[in-house]
Amino acid sequence: MQATDPLFALNAHVEPGRAARQVPDDLGVGASLGHFKRYEVLRCVGEGGMGRVYHAHDPMLRRDVAIKVMRPDVPESERRRFRREAIFGARFCHPSIVRVFDMGELRGDDGKVVEWFTMEYLPGSDLERVLARAAAQGQRLPLLSVVDIFRQVLAALHYAHECAVVHRDVKPANIFVTRDPNTRFLTTKLLDFGIALDLEGPARLEVLCGNPFYMAPEQTEIGGAIDARADVYAAGLTFYEVLTGRHPFEDLREAPVEAVFAAQRRRVPLPPSALLGRDTPPRLASAVDMIFERASAKDPEERFQSARDMMEAMLVFLSPV
């Protein structure tokens, strides 16, 4: 495998060496966190709007973990999302869904409470960064790698749907990929169930939430009825983007949210095969278009009716002959 392959770096830590220097390490290297000083913080590996993620070690179980720490000043809505992500991650048990191990609170000297949870530590990168790296190199991901990634993503979604949970935020940034250090096979993990919908409760939207570029038409309207097919739609748009390197509505990146919602409801994107190389075999080009068209149908009744249906179609039509 060439060192320029955007997936090549997945056997290393996330942005090795750089994140630890660039991101403030507020917990402090060598700090302890949790009951009986259980977790030893090693370094900060990332930062987002809600807080930071640390690489740490659990000496009791002799394993590395990731600690997600929420900022103390975030609004209550973000706190609920943070807790929801932890609760669903702890509830699920699937090889393609990141596992959550523990949850707790820290009280600072100023009296502010900081919430945290631990999850499995994954060296690698999310698909958003992989796509950015590929674009910088003028490359696209190989079709077989894309099929392998989505085989695992769709299996994870099917499992969640069987548990009566809709993710509602499927996108490249929430799909993490790494390589098994021994087999070199791709391992994919679905992340962040923070805005997931429990179908055992009300399934109609009272507030809009999610990334507008991956929201199904029924997610863009208050009162829309949501089920597993909303995730199928998001998976279809993500499949298009990962395969071609461009989002179906790439031209709307700077547009108002209302314009993106309108496109999700009414606009039919260019077929993905139009963005692939001319050397793409006609059989594969037709299969790619068919899978995207079925997954991203505006009417939920015309989509794949489950994540498993989409996965099986990909394996039948896009696997090597």
PLM region spans:
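Conserved N-lobe ATP-binding subsite of Hanks-type protein kinase domains
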Residues: 52
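AlphaC helix of the eukaryotic protein kinase fold
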Residues: 71-91
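Activation-segment/catalytic-loop signature of the eukaryotic protein kinase fold
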Residues: 103
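Conserved short submotifs of the Hanks-type protein kinase catalytic core
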Residues: 110-126
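Activation segment signature within eukaryotic-like protein kinase domains
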Residues: 149-150
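Protein kinase catalytic-loop region centered on the HRD/HxD motif
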Residues: 154-165
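C-terminal lobe helix-coil module of Hanks-type protein kinase domains
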Residues: 213-321
